[in-house]
Amino acid sequence: MDIELSYKAKQVMVDCISLAQQAFKRSFPIPSITFNVRGKAAGKAYLQLNQIRLNPILFRENPQAFLEEVIPHEVAHLITYQVYGRVRPHGKEWRGVMESVFGISANTTHRFEVTSVQGKTFEYRCGCMTYPLSIRRHNKVLRKEATYSCQKCHQPLNFTGVQLS
């Protein structure tokens, strides 16, 4: 991970913790931060570990959005857990931390271009359309651990033999 981006990420995280400490009038431990999330997820909060993990590829491609939205989003999960315990991940407590404490819209999903981090996909067909299945789902079909059906016609999806990406 780029040293400058890593530094900025840690600074945003510390700033969020500081805002939370002022709002809740108590101290919070500084979380650890790593850059090892893979796939389409931008970040993940590990509540019991007090740790934030970020996707390094998406971070490099979308640094401003990570600094302004993703990192506060993940810190809000940690703060919510430490203040309220186990509650719904994007429930009213988390939304309150995002909006009232951090002053940020409580968005639950990102809108980043994920082509660079998207895994292999395989074409499957039913009676009415085609579907791209992830490599994980494709492998489950090959190992006969799962079958998938169309949401419209309810027919089983069958592999066409085409790898899409």
UniProtKB/Swiss-Prot annotation:
This is Protein SprT. It comes from Vibrio parahaemolyticus serotype O3:K6 (strain RIMD 2210633). One of its GO terms (biological process) is response to stress. Its main location: cytoplasm. Keywords: Cytoplasm, Metal-binding, Zinc. The keyword Amino-acid biosynthesis does not apply. Its cofactor is Zn(2+). The active site is at E74. Belongs to the SprT family.
